[in-house]
Amino acid sequence: MRSYRKLSTFLLSIILLLTLLLTPVQAALLDEVRTIIEAAYVDPVDEALLQADSVEEILEKLNDPHSVFFTPEEYQAFLDSIGDSRFSGIGVQIESVPEGILVVNVLPNSPAEAANIRAGDIILSVDGKSLQGLTTEQAVPIMRGPEGSQIKVTIKRGKSIFALPILRQTVVIPSVKAELLDKNIGYIDIDSFGLESISEFRQGVDALRSKGAKAFIIDLRNNTGGYLVSALDIAGYFIGSDPALKTQSRNKTSITNAYKQRRDISEPSIFLVNEFSASASEILAAAVQDHDKALIIGQTTYGKGTMQRVFQLGSGEGFLKLTTARFFSPNGNTIEGKGIIPDLLIQENDPLKAAQLLLSGSGTSHNITFRIGRLNYSVDTRIAATPDYWSAYQELINQLPDYTLYRLSEESEWQVTDPQQLQESYLFYFPAYQKLNHLESIPEDKEFCISFSQALENESFNKDTLQLIEASSGERIALDFLFLGSRQVVVTPKSKLEEGKSYWLLIHPEVELSGQGKLGIGRVTTIKVGTKESLETIKVL
């Protein structure tokens, strides 16, 4: 019993000593943090956690990466990191990862770009100070500093680790950038949701409309969040004052509506997202997706479905950013840990190209229109068939939902895609072309004899009117032509074809028949390379 009493007295002495070591200000801050967490944290908190001896220990036991204590300097850096900002630093957007700080994006004309830092690099340390285990808010003050000062950053790129000297410079970041693409598509890149974002967005929309924008692409890639009010403002352009999200705090569930704007965006619109689209970005993307106001393209988003509130401690001696609620999409879908799944998952190609294609239709006979969800999007197949867009369109087709409705013109009937059509994807590149035949197991050095029922105008037969295209990449294979009389031509690829690959031999409508004018309707022969030995004749009636 005596030993127990001695131990109890010893432990009590330690607790009293630790308490006495805290200054009155620190003790007051600690008590205030305990009170705030007990009352406002999203989940009930164990009493033992609140009895920890310091703010840092309480937050460590809370095990919530989004609940953070700021010094006044760290809080100012946190505010500077949201939205439009001017600061002295190296010019990177970052996320915290276990090894250190991940570079999400390198700003144009920044010191980081000049030093060849790349997105995907991990910053391990700055001037020998490890960034491992730090939040982004804690890392920012370390990376920023007086203009003209030099720091040495240690970078991990793949398996390589190396150090780089970087000179800090003033970096200015507008949160919204707007430009016109393809003469009629308004492209708006929202870098983050700052307090000025809505006015910048409004100015961008108005300017793009004045330049002739008939559709919009909203780019939320690498946008890690910001002020909720700005996301709700921008959501109002698309969903009016309808519900934008559901929130669930410890004691209640509520619905938050978007803020209706003086003029909505009713033009066809597409949102781009990726794995670094988080928080307020996910709120905006989920809102337009649930209300069927826009198509979402890209990769599954980050999955940060919690909301934080900042509490000032004392008279400004510190600040507590605390998770106070979880949020869900308007339809109640969970975002935390799951993210927003795009309507079209584009991972191998640039989602921007896929979006441009879906908005490229111009009411011509070359359009193919897809109905995705409740919305229609038209592709100009002439653009889709160019080398720059071929691969992106191929992935787009492969990612179409099963049995997607499509039509070949405004006057034609809606049809439904099926697995066979998706395998023969030439239908979506050259929808009006007539299929002649399919050649299987064709050798790598194959020659093709094309036979016409009428005499040809040989001058109309050239590299633009007859093409051999590798189906998956869109690569054009150079050809030699040998005319056999007036009705036959032997076509020889200048390089060997690749075994196992598929090719399309295309006779375009511009080929002319003697005395008859242009062919009018294109022809396609599908080819699978194998080992068969023979001279194939392709007949064009």
Functional labels for PLM-detected ranges:
Residues 111-122, 144-146, 287, 501:
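A short glycine-leucine-enriched loop at secondary-structure breakpoints
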Residues 112-134, 216-219:
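Conserved PDZ fold ligand-binding element
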Residues 30-81, 425, 430, 445-449, ...:
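Interdomain regulatory linker/hinge segments that flank or connect interaction modules
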Residues 65-101, 105, 165, 475-481:
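PDZ/PDZ-like peptide-tail recognition elements
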Residues 179-217, 221-439, 541:
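C-terminal "post-core" interaction segments
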